[in-house]
Amino acid sequence: MIYKVLYQKDKIVNPRRETTQTLYMEADNIVQARALVEQNTPYNIELIQELTGNSLKYEQEHADFKLTAFGQTNSED
């Protein structure tokens, strides 16, 4: 499954909507998605959303859609 993860770059600064960033990733479930992000980044996770059907198609066509793979070279910085 593909997940959209909304996050802040670190856990120290108070979250602000204007600084929220997005990454897309594959995982078996939402728990695994959260664990992968927490283990591999210092990010403050705001929301993890499963993308399916029309919402996945929309993101692929209208956003800077690039899957992040942890354990390899990350596609997001």
Curated annotation (Swiss-Prot):
Signal sequence residues? none
Q: Which GO terms describe its molecular function?
A: DNA binding; DNA-directed RNA polymerase activity
- GO terms for cellular component: DNA-directed RNA polymerase complex
EC number(s) on file: 2.7.7.6
Q: Does the keyword Transferase apply?
A: yes
Superkingdom of this protein's organism: Bacteria
Keywords, ordered alphabetically: DNA-directed RNA polymerase, Nucleotidyltransferase, Transcription, Transferase
Spell out the reaction equation it catalyses: RNA(n) + a ribonucleoside 5'-triphosphate = RNA(n+1) + diphosphate
Which biological process annotations from GO are given for this protein? DNA-templated transcription
Concerning its family, UniProt says: Belongs to the RNA polymerase subunit epsilon family.
On assembly, the entry states:
RNAP is composed of a core of 2 alpha, a beta and a beta' subunit. The core is associated with a delta subunit, and at least one of epsilon or omega. When a sigma factor is associated with the core the holoenzyme is formed, which can initiate transcription.
Provide the function of this protein: A non-essential component of RNA polymerase (RNAP).
Checking HAMAP family in the record gives:
RNApol_bact_RpoY
- State the name under which the record lists this protein: DNA-directed RNA polymerase subunit epsilon
Organism whose genome encodes this protein: Lactobacillus delbrueckii subsp. bulgaricus (strain ATCC 11842 / DSM 20081 / BCRC 10696 / JCM 1002 / NBRC 13953 / NCIMB 11778 / NCTC 12712 / WDCM 00102 / Lb 14)
Gene name tied to this protein: rpoY
